[in-house]
Amino acid sequence: MAHPFTLLVTVGSTLFPSLTSHVLLPTFLSLLQSLGVQRLVVQYGRAELKLQDDVKQTLNIDSQGDGIGVWSDNDGDRVRDEKQNGMVVEVMRFTNDFEGLVGKSDAVISHAGSGSILTVLRRAPPIPLLVVPNRSLMDDHQSELADALYKDGYVMVASVEDLEEKVQPFLKIWPSQAKLFPETRKEVFREVVDDLMGYD
């Protein structure tokens, strides 16, 4: 049996409540479900989740801030499990195995933190990545990184405000265009240090 199409949304350890709250809106959950997402995992960091009542009821969040439930857009009828055409939705504050979480995902929506981005881009085969810079940060370095990676064709970029517009091409078209990020060449660093120190 093939595993369910899984979308990971991650903000690392930062606060990005506008993104995490947005992807957990009933309208956005229904959109994802209509686009074929069968499992949504939202890693939301230190933020306080602001959820609408029907989503809060579905997720049954525990004292650690983790929760799981099944979302369905069946005219408000609740479902017991994903076999009834529901989308599994899981929320977690943090994970001890981010690489493993990425490895189990078919696509990732991420804040533009360099650690999160590089973890996704270094996976082979490439995993489609939609980067949402947190423009509320003072120096807006996330936008610079996201724009540079977009220009080189490694990621798609969206804002929280245009996420609905971008998510369909991201899930339907981008997977065939995702390309592998170049492997880190550790010997280059050694060569630069040797050259600076005058070693031959």
UniProtKB/Swiss-Prot annotation:
Q: Which organism is it from?
A: Cryptococcus neoformans var. neoformans serotype D (strain JEC21 / ATCC MYA-565) (Filobasidiella neoformans)
Work out whether the entry's keyword set contains Endoplasmic reticulum.
yes
Q: Which gene encodes it?
A: ALG13
Any Pfam family from its record, for instance, is: Glyco_tran_28_C
Q: What class of enzyme is it?
A: transferase
The record's Gene Ontology biological-process terms are:
dolichol-linked oligosaccharide biosynthetic process
Location relative to the cell:
Endoplasmic reticulum
Protein name per its UniProtKB record: UDP-N-acetylglucosamine transferase subunit ALG13
Single GO cellular component annotation? Answer: endoplasmic reticulum
According to its UniProt entry, the function of this protein is described as:
Involved in protein N-glycosylation. Essential for the second step of the dolichol-linked oligosaccharide pathway.
Q: Which UniProt keywords apply?
A: Endoplasmic reticulum, Glycosyltransferase, Transferase
